[in-house]
From Swiss-Prot:
The keyword Hydrolase does not apply. The active site is at residue 95. CDD domains: OMP_decarboxylase_like. It holds the Pfam family OMPdecase. Gene3D superfamilies: Aldolase class I. GO terms for biological process: 'de novo' pyrimidine nucleobase biosynthetic process; 'de novo' UMP biosynthetic process. Its EC number is 4.1.1.23. Signal peptide: none annotated. This is Orotidine 5'-phosphate decarboxylase. It comes from Ralstonia nicotianae (strain ATCC BAA-1114 / GMI1000) (Ralstonia solanacearum). It comes from the Bacteria.
Amino acid sequence: MRFTEQLAAAWQRNNSLLCVGLDPDPARLPASLTTSGGAIFSFCRAIVDATADLVCAFKPQIAYFASQRAEDQLEQLIAYIHEAYPGIPVILDAKRGDIGSTAEHYAKEAFERYQADAVTVSPYMGFDSMQPYLVHPDKGVIVLCRTSNAGGSDVQFLETNGRPVYQVVAERARDAWNTSGQMGLVVGATFPQEIRRVREIVGDMPLLIPGIGVQGGDIEATVRAGRTADGTGMMINSSRAILYASSDSDFADAARGVAQATRDQINQYRN
């Protein structure tokens, strides 16, 4: 099944636009897990088990695994999600961007080694740096557009032919790059006006929207700006607010509580 089909099915099946980011910080893992090997996998698996019926996607951030030499645990985690919760897509948050020959290997890393359903990429080096991902027809390619960090404005608001760069990226994704319907865009919840503008440009293209929770993005403004006509079209990501809802042995139950409250708050504004 194609990534976009998986995502649409998950929106409906779980009545959810919530994406849970899996960013396991070793310094914040519960003490009950840190005394044994495989703590990162065990922590993330518990979060997945507690929230799988509440989400439309999971998004592991590769740096949190690679910095701990835990790439094998990332492979194990994605395989576990696919086996235990088939139909919930996994987005590898890698934000890759390099020349085509190198991008071919990054694509193999994401889609063959890790078996992710989608990957985040940077458009800064142009279409030929993204093309190697698009030759995997069932996979999603989610392009950075208007990111949630304040410093994104340094580049994304520079003007070219009277338009800010982030709008040009959205237009290119709509017109020239998305030839096989595999693309989505990253647009931060911290900038709802830009979410609305991107939605106007790209129509029903899926948007990955980080920035609610700890980063302070407003859920109501985000949903109203980014929803499509049928009340979907978004993967609204929350990571730290869910993962670290408790530092004790009840961390998974606490994560479920925050995830359910977030999912339900999002749903208030979908229609």
